[in-house]
UniProtKB/Swiss-Prot annotation:
Coiled coil: none annotated. It comes from Deinococcus deserti (strain DSM 17065 / CIP 109153 / LMG 22923 / VCD115). GO terms for cellular component: ribonucleoprotein complex; ribosome. NCBIfam families: rpmH_bact (TIGR01030). Belongs to the bacterial ribosomal protein bL34 family. It holds the Pfam family Ribosomal_L34. InterPro entries: Ribosomal_bL34 (IPR000271), Ribosomal_bL34_CS (IPR020939). This is Large ribosomal subunit protein bL34. One of its GO terms (biological process) is translation. The gene is rpmH.
């Protein structure tokens, strides 16, 4: 049986990256929440 997690850097960035987050209102809300919480890493692009 094939496993569900097949790592791919490009897909990861396109789906969860900073620019992807900035594209939508809800994505910007996510970034705002993470900034408010003081997260060191806002998105997967910050690795």
């Amino acid at each position: 049986m094939k496993r569900t997690y097949q790592p791919n850097v490009r897909k990861r960035a396109k789906t969860h990256g900073f620019r992807a987050r900035m594209k939508t209102k809800s994505g910007r809300n996510i970034l705002a929440r993470r900034r408010a919480k003081g997260r060191h890493q806002l998105t997967v692009a910050d690795e």
